[in-house]
């Protein structure tokens, strides 16, 4: 029976399934071919032909088994290849180890042969050494005596050099203490100098005159210190002489004369000290009474203000004199209230008149004078009719505005002075106090003086040059900020002083002239070091003898080669002969020789 023909959809489904199975099988065979090609085998080909004479057909199960078998065979071959590779590597490693063992064995045999030869040569040399040992012992005793003598001389030299070193260390310590003392004196001098200047001038020195005054103070302070030291020295001398005179009073007929001369010298020194002290006090008073530049400027401004106030007071007196006559007339009025009111009105009127006179003064500002000019023409008429003081209010308001703008002017002048004269420290203005014209005039005067000084002194560098110098100093001495310039300058100054002191001390120690250069100093120090090295080499040559260093090195190498074998041989001899001392080997061998005979 034939199966019933399926519908078109039923016929398409098995065909699609067959196609997918076929594609899957082909993909599996392709993977098998890839494995075969990786192992160097030829791939299998899937042939699509209708002629089946030259072909062998497998079913699906057999083809699947074939694929599995091929996979297993390929994996087994790869595993076997890995095992073979590992076996080859282990075999090579074992061969290398065997070669190393063979080389070690040959080295050991060679070493054993060398040791046997050494033993034979040592046995042959023992006889010679027995004969030479006695002679060498005598020679060594003589050498030991010579070396002991050389050792004594070297010890004496060593002690001498130690004494020299201790003396040099003491001198170095004394020089260090002297340097510390001088540094402390220098610091005390600077401190006292600044303290006296601050006491005299109440400020910090920053001008050329201040430096000159500091030099003058330093000069007088050094003079006073010198006189004090001389006085102390003379007092010590007088005390020592008095002691000596007390001891030898009977034998010294001129004791009273010496005492009188010393007393006279003391009086003279005391009078000199008193004169210098009085001169110092006079200078201090003179410096205290002298005004500073700032005070002079303030005095000038105060004089100008007083002149202005004097002129104003004269004008007020002229205005008040006619008013007094009016007051005398008003005294006759019967009403007391009216009299008081009149006095108050008079005072107000005087104040307004004074304000008006100030405003209409030709010395007033130009803007204010122009605005008040219309009221000034009819001033007398206004005084008679309605007093005409209505124009004062806007003028005073404008004046107040101008005064408030003084703060901005002060700030701008301050910035300008900081740019032009940054070394002048301006006082900080208190907020409670108003801005005064004197302060503005002071700032302007300082700037004008600096400009005039710059014009007079053409050699004085400008601000850019000074800034370039400061930046160059910062680059040279690694100063990051301006605040570190002065400490680094002090450090450089102290280092330079230390170097100059060291150079001066070396010149004195080496007995060189103070005008000699550093090259001469370095060359003399090099010569001195060379002489010391030559002296040390000569001493080493005296200790080692006439032989050179190369022969000594050869002897030491021969000793290092010979001594281990000889030590082993002597240890064996000591064990065989049952002896603990090397000196007993020769007598023991002689005894054995006698016993053998």
Curated annotation (Swiss-Prot):
Residues 66-179, 254-320 form a coiled coil. One of its GO terms (cellular component) is cytoplasm. InterPro entries: CEP70, TPR_rpt. It comes from the Eukaryota. One of its GO terms (molecular function) is gamma-tubulin binding. The keyword Phosphoprotein does not apply. GO terms for biological process: cilium assembly; regulation of microtubule cytoskeleton organization. PROSITE patterns: TPR, TPR_REGION. TPR repeats lie at residues 483-516. Its main location: cytoplasm. It is found in: Cytoplasm, Cytoskeleton, Microtubule organizing center, Centrosome. Residues 1-24 are annotated as: Disordered. Keywords: Coiled coil, Cytoplasm, Cytoskeleton, TPR repeat. Directly interacts with tubulin-gamma; this interaction determines centrosomal localization. Plays a role in the organization of both preexisting and nascent microtubules in interphase cells. During mitosis, required for the organization and orientation of the mitotic spindle. The coiled-coil domains may be important for tubulin-gamma-binding and hence for centrosomal localization. This is Centrosomal protein of 70 kDa. It comes from Macaca fascicularis. The gene is CEP70.
């Amino acid at each position: 029976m034939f199966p019933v023909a399926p519908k078109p959809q039923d016929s398409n489904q098995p065909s699609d399934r067959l196609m997918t199975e076929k594609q899957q099988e082909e993909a599996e065979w392709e993977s098998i071919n890839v494995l075969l090609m990786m192992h160097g085998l030829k791939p299998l080909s899937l042939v699509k032909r209708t002629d089946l004479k030259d072909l062998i057909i497998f079913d699906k199960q057999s083809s699947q088994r074939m694929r599995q078998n091929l996979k297993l065979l390929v994996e087994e071959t790869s595993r076997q290849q890995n095992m073979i590779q590992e076996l080859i590597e282990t075999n090579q490693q074992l061969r290398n180890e065997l070669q190393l063992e063979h080389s070690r064995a040959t080295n050991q045999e060679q070493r054993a042969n060398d040791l046997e030869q050494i033993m034979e040569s040592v046995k042959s040399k023992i006889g010679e050494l027995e004969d030479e040992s006695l002679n060498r012992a005598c020679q060594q005793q003589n050498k030991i005596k010579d070396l002991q003598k050389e050792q004594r001389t070297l010890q004496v030299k060593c002690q001498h050099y130690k004494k020299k070193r201790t003396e040099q260390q003491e001198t170095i310590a004394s020089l260090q203490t002297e340097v510390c003392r001088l540094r402390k004196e220098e610091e005390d001098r600077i401190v006292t100098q600044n303290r006296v200047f601050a006491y005299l001038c109440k400020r910090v020195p920053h001008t050329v005159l201040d430096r000159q005054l500091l030099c003058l103070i330093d000069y007088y302070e050094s003079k006073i210190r010198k006189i004090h030291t001389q006085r102390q020295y003379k007092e010590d001398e007088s005390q020592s002489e008095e002691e000596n005179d007390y001891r030898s009073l009977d034998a010294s007929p001129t004791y009273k004369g010496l005492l009188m001369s010393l007393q006279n010298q003391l009086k003279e020194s005391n009078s000199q000290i008193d004169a210098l002290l009085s001169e110092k006090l006079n200078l201090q008073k003179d410096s205290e009474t002298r005004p500073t530049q700032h005070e002079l400027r303030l005095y000038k401004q105060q004089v100008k203000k007083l002149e202005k106030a004097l002129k104003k007071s004269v004008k007020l007196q002229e205005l008040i004199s006619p008013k007094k006559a009016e007051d005398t007339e008003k005294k006759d009025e019967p009403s007391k209230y009216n009299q008081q009111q009149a006095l108050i009105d008079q005072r107000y009127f005087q104040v307004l008149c004074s304000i008006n006179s100030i405003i209409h003064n030709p010395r007033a500002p130009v803007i204010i004078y122009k605005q008040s000019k219309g009221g000034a023409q009819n001033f007398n008429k206004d005084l008679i009719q309605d007093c005409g003081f209505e124009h004062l209010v806007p003028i005073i308001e404008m004046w107040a505005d101008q005064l408030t703008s003084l703060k901005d002017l002060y700030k701008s002048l301050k910035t300008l002075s900081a740019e032009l004269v940054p070394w002048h420290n301006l006082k900080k203005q208190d907020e409670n106090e108003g801005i005064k014209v004197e302060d503005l005039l002071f700032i302007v005067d300082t700037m004008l003086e600096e400009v005039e000084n710059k014009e007079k002194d053409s050699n004085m560098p400008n601000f850019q040059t000074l800034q370039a110098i400061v930046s160059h100093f910062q680059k040279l001495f690694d100063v990051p900020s301006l605040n570190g310039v002065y400490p680094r300058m002090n450090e450089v100054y102290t280092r330079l002083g230390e170097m100059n002191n060291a150079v001066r001390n070396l010149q004195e120690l080496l007995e060189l002239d103070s005008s000699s250069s550093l090259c001469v100093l370095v060359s003399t120090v090099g010569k001195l070091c060379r002489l010391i090295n030559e002296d040390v080499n000569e001493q080493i040559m005296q200790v080692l003898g006439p032989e050179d260093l190369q022969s000594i090195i050869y002897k030491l190498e021969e000793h290092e080669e010979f001594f281990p074998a000889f030590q082993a041989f002597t240890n064996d001899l000591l064990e065989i002969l049952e002896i603990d001392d090397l000196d007993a080997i020769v007598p023991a061998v002689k005894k054995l020789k006698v016993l053998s005979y």
